[in-house]
Amino acid sequence: MAVMIQVSELHFTTEDGVKVLEDIHLRVEQGELLYIVGPASSGKSLLLGLLGGQLPPQRGQILVHGRNVGRLSPERRLELRQRIGYLPQGFAPLSRTVHENVLFKLRSLGNFREQAEEKAILALEATGLIRLQGVEAAELSSLDRIRLGLALAVCDDPLLLLIDEPFEGLDANECGEACLLIDRLHTGHLTVVAATRGPLPDVARGQRIVRLVDGAVMES
């Protein structure tokens, strides 16, 4: 099986000398679903940002789809980022309808109008939002807002999907529904890495889980 992410000897230290990530080694196969679980301020969001090319590694190597993130030019890094779907923690949609949010994202990525319309409908169907496409995003429930964030992240057929705290603000049943949706999006070809404080819903049992503790990754 092809490798989507290969991290070797990754270190990251803040400007005031705090070691956040220390000697991280991580391998994610193409088409795999991985949960990274760790407490607040453990470096989960930072690790996702590094994997997504939002900033270069200070030390160590990150390969994404065979490309060395640390050696990419700013232009090439931007190209890579545009091929990665990302749902940030505390995602806030635009003050538009659900459909308009997705359409705006697709148009901003260079899709022509007709192509953007087709992709938007597919993304809304995949995330269970087609019935709410005309609803203002501000009126969505917490779970449906996560659905919209995922629709935005996958609408342009990314190589990789990175999700930061998808269960934040959800009750136990909603966490289970969000987890099942992530699993459905991953099924087939999409590689997914999701970071969360946990605990994971019961429906996540059987998925690969690593824990980020004291700056180090440990397989569960």
Question: Where are these predicted regions, by residue range?
Answer:
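Conserved ABC ATPase signature
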Residues: E136-S142
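Catalytic Walker B motif of ABC-type/P-loop ATPase nucleotide-binding domains
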Residues: L161-E165
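Conserved ABC ATPase "signature" region
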Residues: Q115-L132
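Helix-to-loop junction immediately C-terminal to a conserved catalytic motif
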Residues: G52
